A protein has these predicted regions:
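Intrinsic-disorder/low-complexity, polar/charged segments enriched in Ser/Thr/Lys/Arg/Asp/Glu/Gln
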Residues: 1-5, 60
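Compact, glycine-rich, soluble single-domain proteins
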Residues: 7-57
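C-terminal structural segments of small proteins and small subunits
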Residues: 56-89
Length: 89
């Protein structure tokens, strides 16, 4: 299993549009992808699960990937979050 911790830095946090981008990206990989915030762990391929994290700006998330293309998935998700989901703020 691969794991990385990142911080949500876009102004609106992990809102509906950002969650949709994240789950769409995650769904394109065959591996398992989990996200954790505090005590809550969710499947990153589930938009409802991701939105339930209620990750606002400054929230720290841990991403776990396991299986085929785990490294590629982790790198892609970290890049999306670092790019502020393409929102520029």
């Amino acid at each position: 299993m691969l794991q990385a911790t990142t911080t949500i830095s876009n102004k609106l946090g992990l809102h509906a549009r950002a969650s949709a981008k994240l789950t769409k990206l995650a769904g394109g990989f065959p591996c398992e992808i989990w996200m954790t915030k505090g005590e809550r762990r969710v499947n990153a391929k589930s938009i409802m699960g991701v939105m339930m994290l209620a990750a606002g700006i400054g929230s720290e998330l841990t991403i776990d990937t396991e299986g085929d293309q785990a490294q590629e998935a982790l790198d892609a998700l970290l890049a999306l979050i670092a790019d502020k989901f393409g929102e520029g703020e």
